[in-house]
């Protein structure tokens, strides 16, 4: 039996309207429709500390469990997304 591929979504959030959640959720919906298991950081509960570093700790734990990363447009200008990309490739 073939295992479902697990993909982490990465892209800009900080400074973008609604934290760019609509773009994250649309990409997650499209990938899930193709049978991909998606790790979508836009679906995470806030970390207890509420800091950027806390959010990144959650994100990097998710990324470590994934087989691939899917980069949303504008990721190159995002500090967090460039960290995630650097770790994934």
Q: Model-derived features: where do they sit?
A:
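Conserved catalytic or regulatory cores that recognize and/or transform ribose-phosphate-containing ligands
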Residues: 1-89
